[in-house]
Amino acid sequence: MAGKQLSTKTVVAIGIGAAVFVILGRFVSIPTGIPNTQIETSYAFLALMAVLFGPVAGALIGFIGHLIKDATTFGPWWSWIIVSGVVGLLIGFISNRLKVEEGDFGWKKITLFNAVQAGAQALGWFVIAPVLDIVIYAEPANKVFVQGIVAGISNIITVGVLGTIIIAAYAKTRSKSGSLSKETS
């Protein structure tokens, strides 16, 4: 049985999405005062791409984008790279329920989006990243849990505000299903 292949459109979206993730992560982030922890606008963009292209694209954009960003700075930090992929994956799972390409991103969908993104970020940054930091790098628990909590909270807020705004703006550019009517003479 042949596996489901990614469309050309999705593959291109992954490449462009990873590149934009890198640019935003490198040049449009705000230091928090906690070592190696910034407020990242790249996760709002990741959320948009995951919502538009689904979980596989979201996972790959987060993973590849974060990997390249780290590789061009201080070197790959695998625990956080993995979490970026997990966050993209989990947010992408709701793409079929949101259907923003149909032009509708009302309060129910905004609430669903933010519940899922907050849960994905919390799981990733409050639990997975710190545990992997301890397992992979033998980092001190108190340090990595503080970093994870700060990163998670800032990402939840950034995606909650900026992500919601850009997804809503995108949805407004799409025609609502059934919005056209036939003219009668």
UniProtKB/Swiss-Prot annotation:
Pfam families named among the record's database cross-references: ECF-ribofla_trS
Topology relative to the membrane: Multi-pass membrane protein
UniProt keyword Nucleotide-binding present: no
UniProt keyword annotations, A-Z: Cell membrane, Membrane, Transmembrane, Transmembrane helix
Sequence intervals crossing the membrane: 11-31, 44-64, 74-94, 118-138, 149-169
Cellular component GO terms held in the UniProt record: plasma membrane
Compartments where located: Cell membrane
Xref: InterPro entries: ECF_substrate-spec-like (IPR009825), UPF0397 (IPR022914)
Similarity remark: Belongs to the UPF0397 family.
NCBIfam families per UniProt: PRK13661.1
Protein name from the UniProt record: UPF0397 protein BPUM_3679
